Amino acid sequence: MVTSNVVLVSGEGERFTVDKKIAERSLLLKNYLNDMHDSNLQNNSDSESDSDSETNHKSKDNNNGDDDDEDDDEIVMPVPNVRSSVLQKVIEWAEHHRDSNFPDEDDDDSRKSAPVDSWDREFLKVDQEMLYEIILAANYLNIKPLLDAGCKVVAEMIRGRSPEEIRRTFNIVNDFTPEEEAAIRRENEWAEDR
């Protein structure tokens, strides 16, 4: 069975139908799909004569008009930790990067030194809450390039700023006493004004 679509279900229960290639931008979803494929191969070899029987896949009634030889069954994948608006943004990112090649995820040096793509930089110009949720979703879904881009954008928001400016930017309450803050500044003088 060839599955061309995957239905992602957000935390609120909203369904997003995406092409399998888009879903596979997520290592979590790619592994899930591979496991489903392996499970189906095992099930099919166990019951070869039941090829037309019901499977673990859920089928949608609307068929985009594609009458290819491919089966239009869809795998439903819940994504309970991701809100609909965030999942929609992650899908938008994955669609844009459908055919993109990224540095090897095991090569930390090339990933860390690669600048943020200009499209990604524009894409991540969202309010802070959305940016954080995109980063959390990228982490949960194991989408390293999106996670890296989001973290680099946050790092750029911090770079060159004083602790007070960082607190204002990120709405962080200063819970240090003046004495504690002075001690921390003394301990970290070496990192100031390079």
UniProtKB/Swiss-Prot annotation:
Residues 54-63 have a biased composition (Basic and acidic residues). One of its GO terms (cellular component) is SCF ubiquitin ligase complex. Residues 64-75 have a biased composition (Acidic residues). GO terms for biological process: cellular response to methylmercury; exit from mitosis; G1/S transition of mitotic cell cycle; G2/M transition of mitotic cell cycle; kinetochore assembly; mitochondrial fusion; mitotic cell cycle; mitotic intra-S DNA damage checkpoint signaling. Keywords: Centromere, Chromosome, Cytoplasm, DNA-binding, Kinetochore, Nucleus, Phosphoprotein, Ubl conjugation pathway. CDD domains: BTB_POZ_SKP1. Pathway: Protein modification; protein ubiquitination. Residues 135-194 are annotated as: Interaction with the F-box domain of F-box proteins. The modification Phosphothreonine is found at T177. It is found in: Cytoplasm; Nucleus; Chromosome, Centromere, Kinetochore. GO terms for molecular function: cullin family protein binding; DNA replication origin binding. It comes from the Eukaryota. InterPro entries: SKP1, SKP1-like, SKP1-like_dim_sf, SKP1/BTB/POZ_sf, Skp1_comp_dimer, Skp1_comp_POZ. Residues 38-79 are annotated as: Disordered. Signal peptide: none annotated. Belongs to the SKP1 family. Essential component of the E3 ubiquitin ligase complex SCF (SKP1-CUL1-F-box protein) ubiquitin ligase complex, which mediates the ubiquitination and subsequent proteasomal degradation of target proteins like phosphorylated SIC1. Participates in the attachment of chromosomes to the spindle. Acts as a regulatory component of the centromere DNA-binding protein complex CBF3, which is essential for chromosome segregation and movement of centromeres along microtubules. CBF3 is required for the recruitment of other kinetochore complexes to CEN DNA. Component of the E3 ubiquitin ligase complexes SCF with HRT1, some cullins like CDC53, and some F-box proteins like MET30 CDC4 and SAF1. Interacts with CDC53 and MET30 to form the E3 ubiquitin ligase complex SCF(Met30) which also contains MET4. Forms complex SCF(Cdc4) together with CDC4 and CDC53. Component of the CBF3 complex, which is formed of CBF3A/CBF2, CBF3B/CEP3, CBF3C/CTF13 and CBF3D. Component of the RAVE complex composed of RAV1, RAV2 and SKP1/CBF3D. Interacts with RCY1, ROY1, CBF3D and SGT1. This is Suppressor of kinetochore protein 1. It comes from Saccharomyces cerevisiae (strain ATCC 204508 / S288c) (Baker's yeast).
